[in-house]
């Protein structure tokens, strides 16, 4: 299984849409900053604010990731990875902060036989059949 560091997130090219509710005054202030040229658009301001807050709490995130043995970034699980686990008699616990992706050539039967649990703080990409097979194992 491959793990990609947080620094590689820009190369991954994967984003998730997030919907937030803001008060009209906050929204107006954001629009004013955009209009005055501080940010190119609303999304630019919101991304910058989120990154700044994540930087403020960066050390806490790193400690939590280390304590919980989470993969930080991208974890891609391929058929070969799962076949090796099956041959070795291992059940995998997938724990990711970022993106967990199960390859499209992985069957529901193989994931049921090899994946004990999936915990993703971020996004989980897998076929509908694989998601259904893991439904009772997704934390």
PLM regions: where:
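A detector of short terminal or domain-flanking linear segments
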Residues: 1-14, 83-139
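Short, basic amphipathic alpha-helical segments that act as recognition/interaction helices
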Residues: 3, 8-11, 28-32, 40-64
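Short amphipathic alpha-helix starts
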Residues: 15-32
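Short, surface-exposed, charged/polar-biased interaction segments
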Residues: 51-55, 66-71, 121, 132, ...
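Short, positively charged interaction helices/loops
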Residues: 55-88
């Amino acid at each position: 299984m491959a793990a990609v560091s947080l620094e590689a997130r820009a190369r991954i090219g994967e984003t998730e849409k997030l919907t937030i509710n803001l008060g009209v005054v906050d929204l107006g202030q954001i629009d004013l900053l955009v209009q005055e040229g501080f940010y190119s658009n609303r999304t630019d301001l919101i991304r910058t604010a989120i990154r700044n807050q994540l930087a403020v709490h960066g050390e806490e995130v790193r400690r939590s990731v280390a304590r919980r043995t989470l993969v930080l970034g991208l974890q891609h699980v391929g058929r070969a990875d799962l076949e090796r686990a099956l041959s070795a008699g291992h059940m995998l616990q997938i724990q990711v902060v970022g993106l967990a992706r199960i390859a499209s050539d992985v069957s529901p039967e193989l994931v049921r036989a090899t994946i004990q649990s999936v915990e993703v703080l971020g996004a989980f990409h897998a076929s509908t059949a694989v998601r259904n097979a893991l439904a009772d194992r997704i934390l």
